[in-house]
Amino acid sequence: MDQIDISCIPTTPGVYLYKDPAGKVVYVGKAKHLRRRVASYFRDIQRHTPKTRAMLRSAATVETLSTTTEKEALLLEASLIKKHRPRYNILLRDDKQYVLFQLTRKHHWPRLVLTRKVRKDGSAYFGPFTSGQAARQTWKVIHKVFPLRRCSDKAFRNRVRPCLYHFMNQCPGPCVLDVDRDGYMQMVRKVEMLLAGRSTELIDMLRADMQAASDALEFEEAALLRDQLQAVERTVERQAAVLPGVHDMDAVGLAEAGGGLALSVLFIRRSVLLDKRNFFWSGLTLEEGPEVLLSFLTQYYGPGSFIPPRILVPWDIRTEDREGAELAPAAVCTDAGLLPDTPLLPDCPEAAPLPAAPVFAVSAGDVMPSGHDADPAGTADAPVVRGDSAPEQPLPAAVPPLCAEESASGSALRAVAEMLTELRGGPVRVLPPRNATDNQLVTMATENAREDARAEKRPDVAGVIAAKLGMSAPPVRIEAVDVSHTGGSNTRVGVVVFENGTPARDQYRTYAFADDEAGGDDTGVLALWAVRRVHSGPPWPDLLLVDGGRGQLAAVMTALESAGAGGLFAVASIAKARNEETGRADRRAGNLADRIFLPGRSNPVNFKSGSPELLFLQHVRDTVHDYAIGRHRRARSGAALSGELQRMQGIGPATARLLWEHFSSLQEMVDAGEKGLAALPGIGKAKAAVIHEGLKRLVG
């Protein structure tokens, strides 16, 4: 990129966007002082990191957007990164938030549900959990011990008879029965105490209630309380405290290992290490640490995510006019040991194994309009773990660096804290370690990041793919396309996206084609799709992978060139392995050598069978294949639903879908009778009679 006229750039806070010659955004950054920040890119270029130098080589222009405050610049930067997915920014997958427990306290009859979004609706939220399966198992166990209602609010309003869970003694049936609300709310409070980690208090309450019921000769009630008490006590045995007196917070650690930069975030709730999440960026070093940390904080804790009241980070980051962001003294380990000038941690202990996340132990995450960091009593209900679950030697007390609220006005963490405070609706503190306890948590996160990077071998798959396919740079964004139809009907083209080797499910797309337009011709449909893809615009892939052979590849290339997108990105196709004798696709008997074709080349590219790069391309192809088939089957099912059932009186799309979800055939619907149909949510006796009569005529 040539030198630009710096005098045209404003001196306000804001966001700058570097664009390549085609106008594609390749990097988004924020600055407290736009002119000085942009000017820093053109001073002593050789001192920049390799990634920054590569970005400057690919950039042709730079644009700026001014804001009034640095906090607004952070919000705008996060929004633009999510929109443009720039090649040289640190990108996090945001297709799926982690699982949370939501207790709908504002409802007259609260229920406990699993959710991935935090809403300011008065509910209490607990978590997060990275394993949805473990969270669902926990949810089932909680309902067996404390049988709250399970039905949705809509089903609750429309239900006319108790559901099956009531007859299994797993729901009191407040939807239609006269249930003691005081007793129900007492059960809700017990669930909240369990999820909030107040196990000791809950056990004492259950034991007292059990004794009172026994003294009153209410032995059935006493037996129920005994079962609840035993279940809670078993739960407490599985809980493990990281540090006594530590409450709701996340601890972030970074380490340079495994040929890249690893980041780990620990979720700590009520002294319990609830879960953790690891990230890795190949080719980065601790020189990019400040950028990685700031980008992580602004992307990971976005709108709708769970934001704790306190976030520990490895360093303070001060925004300097001359260079954007630089580190305060760091407490970070590398493969070679500690970085110079790290007074917080005098040594780098061997990594201690992290305590396993409790199967049934969850904790408080209530989002309140006015936040409260921790229990003022400072008590920890879970037992303190000794031995291997925590560092054996306590870290020495450190001179506390300035936290976000106390630091100089130039601290980038202050702007991050202000942004997260606004999103959370309560105070959020983002700060480096201030004492030995904080040091221990950050060290644990740092060591966990390093060990995860070392344990997982990460071959340079993208680099090998780029070399094999003749690409100028490793592909960051890969799009794969496949067609699915049944005899030319309900044709669907599925597109999946992989970024940095992981699926970007929020960017999956489905393209529908009319039967007369598709005609059952896969190559023709792919050509039509290619034109529509060009018209939809960026973000463009670095590599487009077509599921098919030379014919499908040629059709896509011809369409791209006619649409003016020839050479805009690399294109290849992947075809299943074929039997040498029959010429038919055959992946049996270990024949995994699928063939990769390039435009203008008759013979396939030589990929070693079973190599990581070929297995990755096969995984991408299998993903788009399954996705396209799934979308086609959904379209075919929808057509069947609208065909048979919706011609009947009293059945619309919602009722038709409800019937097909509960029955596998029309005959099963008839056999269920009016009583069975009326038991479905939203279908009363009168409607069930009409539907049953229509079904009998339809079946004949």
From Swiss-Prot:
Residues 11-90 form the GIY-YIG domain. GO terms for biological process: nucleotide-excision repair; SOS response. Residues 200-235 form the UVR domain. The keyword DNA repair applies. Its main location: cytoplasm. Keywords: Cytoplasm, DNA damage, DNA excision, DNA repair, Excision nuclease, SOS response. GO terms for cellular component: cytoplasm; excinuclease repair complex. Belongs to the UvrC family. PANTHER family: UVRABC SYSTEM PROTEIN C, UVRC/OXIDOREDUCTASE. This is UvrABC system protein C. The gene is uvrC.
